[in-house]
């Protein structure tokens, strides 16, 4: 007979379908789970499986007893509860059905080539601490004024234009440290002729969808850039993005790759994606080459080698380039 597919979400309740696509938030409610016998599904597939350590996912996983469980994630080394020594692999009994890392995916031509430019950002007081002391409110305000100053706005715009993009017009993402900064920068960019919008987690699904439509489509009120803090780090798929600008310190190789990855989907009329990373004087800078190389050994010599000759180590048409001051900053962080 015919096979029926359906959804279980806040709005859809197709509980009797053969193949059900569900959001964890909805399915994990007890009254929804209990509509199903525990052995109802032969197979359960969990997307964004690095969240499987979260309570809502656990509740669903503990309830069902399928013959087969599969988890899919781009970041298996990341987990929600951040407890050292516990990991996602354990949850899936250390069975890895298939694994592909950035380097290999580039070699296999699964991703769009990227041109990465690590360039000098203006110096600011390091993000949270000065000489081991927390920043005063005054210093934080000064940082904020500085990060959103006309001078820096002009500098960012010049660099973005200089490094360019592939395609008829820019369809860009800009990652900022804080939502206030994203909102303020967006205002200033708009004053200078860019068409931008700042999005945050508090924006509705609809607002986000509308923004993406405007970014991607050429026949409606177009957007050049969406500014955000981390809303685009996972689960959002916009293959058309042809420029990614990083205006924030790198927190971890994982987050860095997730943000870079926003530009790596292939799309028509997009030959490559340009990544412009503004490298300030941050102590985490050494994570950038680690992320780009996929080298998890954290070996200092490898990190240095990668900064100096990244191009020869990255497969395909992609390129990596650090300006001199950025190289210095990374060497200092190592």
Give the ranges of each region predicted by the language model.
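Post-DEXD/H (motif II) to motif III coupling segment of the RecA-like Helicase ATP-binding lobe
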Residues: 42, 51-116
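Conserved helicase ATPase core of P-loop NTP-dependent helicases/translocases
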Residues: 7-16, 32, 183-185, 194-232
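Conserved segment of the helicase C-terminal RecA-like domain
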Residues: 253-258, 262-292
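Conserved interdomain linker/interface between the two RecA-like ATPase lobes of SF2 helicase motors
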Residues: 94-173
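Long, largely alpha-helical accessory region at the distal end of helicase-like NTP-driven motors
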Residues: 152-155, 162, 167, 287-334
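Conserved helix-turn-beta segment of the N-terminal RecA-like "Helicase ATP-binding" lobe
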Residues: 1-7
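A short beta-strand element within the Helicase C-terminal
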Residues: 224-249, 255-258, 273-277
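Conserved helix/coil segment N-terminal to the catalytic DExD/H
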Residues: 10-43, 54-59
